[in-house]
Amino acid sequence: MNDKIKTESVDNLFEAILSLKNTEECYMFFEDICTINELLAIAQRLEVAKLLKEQTTYIEISEETGASTATISRVNRSLKYGNDGYEMVFSRMNKQD
């Protein structure tokens, strides 16, 4: 975990997110706390990660999501060398299906 982001403010943000009970509450909270572009960028990264795990090419991902190759590369680096956060979320999402 990155010590630079481990602050009381970030802890409070995560506690707020964990208090949300459903998708509608997520929309309400995230529309208030994020700009539309910030929220769309986060959603785009999650979609890029999903496509990378499915072995989709950078070109196909860029065409499908509109993500730049720099964004795709950054997400790919997180998938390979990150904290396994994407993997944890995808695993839990698959169990819910």
Language model features by range: what are they?
Residues E25-Q44:
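Short, Lys/Arg-enriched anionic-surface-contact patches
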Residues E60-T65, I72:
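Short alpha-helical "recognition helix" segments of helix-turn-helix
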Residues S9-L13, F29, E47, T71:
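A general alpha-helix detector
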Residues L20-E24, I36, Q55:
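Residues at alpha-helix boundaries and the short loops/turns that link adjacent helices
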Residues I42-T56:
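Short, amphipathic alpha-helical "recognition" segments used to contact nucleic acids or chromatin
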Residues M1-L20:
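General nucleic-acid-binding
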Residues N76-L79:
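DNA major-groove recognition helix of helix-turn-helix
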Residues N83-D97:
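Short Lys/Arg-enriched helix C-cap and helix-to-coil transition segments
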